[in-house]
UniProtKB/Swiss-Prot annotation:
It comes from the Bacteria. This is ATP synthase gamma chain. Belongs to the ATPase gamma chain family. NCBIfam families: ATPsyn_F1gamma (TIGR01146). Pfam families: ATP-synt. InterPro entries: ATP_synth_F1_ATPase_gsu, ATP_synth_F1_gsu.
Length: 287
């Protein structure tokens, strides 16, 4: 009875692994479809580049603004973009490990010197379990978010710098490089101290109303668009990471199925050989 029991066990494992393979394959195909639809990134990038050009033109004429000037740092804000779901390989863990405040000096920052703004349920759960100061969060965003979906948290985030709550603000997210490569990125969002260095004046504009009023309107919009652009970048990275993770899971499941099938065939052959041997032995005993 033992070989038969072993055959049943192997067959059960094969069927279970096949079902798992079907699920991971379906998830891979869904993620591939979502990645192919994540085309808003290019539109937003063009929009940000145009705002950059206009603002750099104004600022290069000697106009200053609080969002363009560094100040003594008493409190730092960290905007962290994660996903609402797992099964995406190291997508989330790479980001939260970068933010977890064992900074370069390997010392924990006092809670009153930093605060965290989280996009995504995975990051929110991670930081709350460690009693880290999360002051803003948003979850359950759609797979193809519009600016309206994050307008409120983007406005509040920029406002926390404008009102002096934060003296500097950093973003952490996964930057989409390709379907098989995503890079964990740390980007200084505010103040925009590198803004002028990265943008040389290209076009001469005539401004109406005053240049100061233009900066008051455009700089917050630009900072908010940077947050939205990072979110779209992170969403594309999430879909790519999940697609890759599910493909690897499907490939591994297929390898297991092949190994189990080989074991099943060998066990079945051994069982048949044993039965034939017993029949022949019984016949010889009767003679």
């Amino acid at each position: 009875m033992k070989p038969l029991a072993s055959l049943r066990d192997i067959k059960t494992r094969i069927n279970a692994t096949k079902k798992t393979s079907q699920i991971t394959k379906a998830m891979e195909m869904v993620s591939t479809s979502k990645l192919n639809r994540a085309a808003k990134r290019e539109i937003v990038r063009s929009y940000m580049e145009k705002i950059q050009e206009v603002v750099a033109n104004v600022a290069s004429r000697g106009r200053s603004h609080p969002m363009l000037v560094s100040r003594p740092v008493k409190k730092t804000g960290y905007l962290v973009i994660t996903s609402d779901r797992g099964l995406a390989g190291a997508y989330n863990s790479n980001v939260v490990r970068l933010v977890y405040p064992k900074r370069s000096k390997n010392a924990m920052l006092p809670p009153d010197e930093y605060a965290i703004i989280v996009i995504g349920r995975v990051g929110l759960s991670f930081f709350r379990k460690r009693n880290m100061p999360v002051i803003l969060d948003i979850t359950r965003l759609p797979d193809q978010p519009s600016f309206a979906d994050i307008k409120e948290i983007a406005r509040k985030t920029v406002g926390l710098f404008a009102d002096g709550t934060f003296d500097e603000l950093y973003m952490y997210y996964n930057h989409y490089v390709s379907a098989i490569q995503q890079e964990v990125t740390e980007r200084k969002l505010l103040p925009l101290t590198d803004f002028l260095a990265e943008n040389k004046q290209r076009t001469v504009y005539e401004f109406e109303p005053s240049q100061e009023e233009i900066l008051d309107v455009l700089l917050p919009q630009y900072a908010e668009s940077l947050i939205y652009g990072a979110l779209l970048d992170a969403k594309a990275s999430e879909h790519a990471a999940r697609m890759t993770a599910m493909k690897n899971a499907t490939d591994n499941a297929n390898d297991v199925i092949r190994t189990l099938t080989l074991s099943y065939n060998r066990a079945r052959q051994a069982a048949i050989t044993q039965e034939i041997t017993e029949i022949v032995a019984g016949r010889n005993a009767l003679q």
